[in-house]
């Protein structure tokens, strides 16, 4: 028998955006319902995206570290692990994350509904359960935090047993010797690192003229060189004409006339917002061609009581930003406005091997803006900590205004880059004279540390001034 429930707010989706919104609402005293279509909370971030891919990457990087460090191994003793082996590690992390996040909802008395959500009208949502039954929920405010999914062109047979997207690759059951990755964005590059780290041949097909073009060009070039040096074959400015599944693999026919064959293919070219099936037509909302919703600065859609956060609104499509967006939407919902907003310079972390992380402007952007900047660099190979741990590939680059010494951008390539970047970000976010390169010269760092790279880079940059 169908039941009817009323809440202060309904949150559709339990990924980072949904969690941020739900926690923000209950902490302000709201009675909240959370609808999650999957069996467990956490969304795509926990189950198919950020968490599993980073867990896989970590496992592979530790294998590489062991095999390359003469302290641990020699030619007669190396570690070899299969994709299935490292998937076990990812599964353990996923289970830990799921239990932890379920605890958040339980402790804060969120009302959980496991089913598919669709709008009946602007304040009413139907929840359809796996057994075919349904309930009706009503609320004064609703948050759409349904995330995104891999884009699947209609002319690619994703039912073929050797053709995967970034969700289904976690179900890889055979041990490939050769993988084609179509799409050289963040996901494609991260999986190229993972597979190559397992000694799998990798063909990385890039539809653009360089890798990760949004990065500072030096960082992009460093990744390209590192891939090349480790045997990844990169094919730039290529598009597929046909993707042909065979009995023992996949053949990609490129528009340039070339053909590439491998054991399997990972299609990682684009994502689509999860808005189909939500019944948006029943409330007068319409997603764009990529399934994304348009919102204002408080994450309100065209309907002021319906909010949207996370991947379903597009850029920046980061788990970190999605959580903050959810918190901001919750504050706006309860108080009528939000007194916090996303920071202007959101850091990016790309978990290739080695990592890449950036915050602020690139050299190319500053040159186009005609900003008089200077560069300070530190090579990891010159840091005692990097030498001790045997991870001396990489560098830190600080861009600063040559007159005011204000930090304008920070770019890091190397192990722990995504952690290292936040030291510089903290100074960049200071107002007025607090944002200065000289902070790194005038403070004392622990020694030996990777953080010391900031002092080295700052001194290097200041020595360039005249």
Swiss-Prot record:
GO terms for biological process: 2-oxoglutarate metabolic process; NADP metabolic process; pyruvate metabolic process. Its cofactor is FAD. Disulfide bonds: none annotated. This is Soluble pyridine nucleotide transhydrogenase. It is found in: Cytoplasm. InterPro entries: Class-I_Pyr_Nuc-Dis_Oxidored, FAD/NAD-bd_sf, FAD/NAD-binding_dom, FAD/NAD-linked_Rdtase_dimer_sf, Pyr_nuc-diS_OxRdtase, Pyr_nucl-diS_OxRdtase_dimer, STH_gammaproteobact. One of its GO terms (cellular component) is cytosol. Conversion of NADPH, generated by peripheral catabolic pathways, to NADH, which can enter the respiratory chain for energy generation. It comes from the Bacteria. The keyword Magnesium does not apply. Its EC number is 1.6.1.1. It catalyses: NAD(+) + NADPH = NADH + NADP(+). It comes from Yersinia pestis. One of its GO terms (molecular function) is flavin adenine dinucleotide binding. FAD binds at residues 36-45. Belongs to the class-I pyridine nucleotide-disulfide oxidoreductase family. Keywords: Cytoplasm, FAD, Flavoprotein, NAD, NADP, Oxidoreductase. It is an enzyme of class 1 (oxidoreductase). Binds 1 FAD per subunit. Gene3D superfamilies: 3.30.390.30, FAD/NAD(P)-binding domain. The gene is sthA. It holds the Pfam family Pyr_redox_dim. SUPFAM superfamilies: FAD/NAD(P)-binding domain, FAD/NAD-linked reductases, dimerisation (C-terminal) domain.
């Amino acid at each position: 028998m169908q039941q009817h429930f009323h809440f202060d707010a309904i949150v559709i989706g339990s990924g980072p955006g949904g969690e941020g919104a739900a926690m923000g609402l209950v902490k302000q005293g709201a009675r909240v319902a959370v609808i999650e279509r999957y069996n467990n909370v956490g969304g795509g971030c926990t189950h198919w995206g950020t968490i599993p891919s980073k867990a896989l990457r970590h496992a592979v990087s530790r294998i590489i570290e062991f095999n390359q460090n003469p302290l641990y191994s020699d030619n007669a003793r190396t570690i070899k692990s299969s994709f299935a082996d490292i998937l076990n590690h990812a599964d353990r992390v996923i289970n830990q994350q799921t239990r932890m996040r379920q605890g958040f909802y339980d402790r804060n008395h969120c009302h959980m509904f496991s089913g598919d959500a669709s709008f009946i009208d602007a304040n009413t949502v139907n929840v359809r359960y796996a057994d075919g039954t349904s309930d009706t929920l009503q609320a004064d405010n609703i948050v759409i935090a349904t995330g995104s999914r891999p884009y699947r062109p209609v002319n690619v047979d994703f039912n073929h047993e050797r053709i995967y997207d970034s969700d289904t690759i976690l179900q890889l059951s055979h041990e490939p010797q050769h993988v084609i990755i179509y799409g050289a964005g963040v996901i494609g590059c991260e999986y190229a690192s993972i597979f190559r780290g397992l000694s799998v041949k990798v063909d990385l097909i890039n539809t653009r003229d360089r890798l990760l073009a949004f990065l500072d060009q030096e960082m992009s070039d460093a990744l390209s060189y590192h891939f090349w040096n480790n045997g990844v074959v990169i094919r730039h400015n290529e598009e597929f004409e046909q993707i042909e599944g065979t009995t023992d693999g996949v053949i990609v026919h490129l528009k340039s006339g070339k053909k590439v064959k491998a054991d399997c293919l990972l299609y990682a070219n684009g994502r689509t917002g999860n808005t189909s099936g939500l019944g948006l037509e029943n409330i007068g909302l319409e997603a764009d061609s990529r399934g994304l919703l348009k919102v204002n600065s408080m994450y309100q859609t065209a309907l002021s009581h319906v909010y949207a956060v996370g991947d379903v609104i597009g850029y920046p499509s980061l788990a970190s930003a999605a959580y903050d967006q959810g918190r901001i939407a919750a504050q706006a919902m309860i108080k009528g406005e939000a007194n916090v907003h996303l920071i202007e310079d959101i850091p990016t972390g790309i978990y290739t091997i080695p990592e890449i992380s950036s915050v602020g402007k690139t050299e190319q952007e500053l040159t186009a803006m005609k900003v008089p900047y200077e560069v300070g660099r530190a090579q990891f190979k010159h840091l005692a900590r990097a030498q001790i741990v045997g991870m001396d590939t990489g560098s830190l680059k600080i861009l600063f205004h040559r007159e005011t010494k204000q930090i304008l951008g920070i770019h890091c390539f190397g192990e722990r880059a995504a952690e290292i970047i936040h030291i510089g970000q903290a100074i960049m976010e200071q107002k007025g004279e607090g944002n200065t390169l000289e902070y790194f010269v005038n403070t004392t760092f622990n020694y030996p540390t990777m953080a010391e790279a900031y002092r080295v880079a700052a001194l290097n940059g200041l020595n360039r001034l005249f």
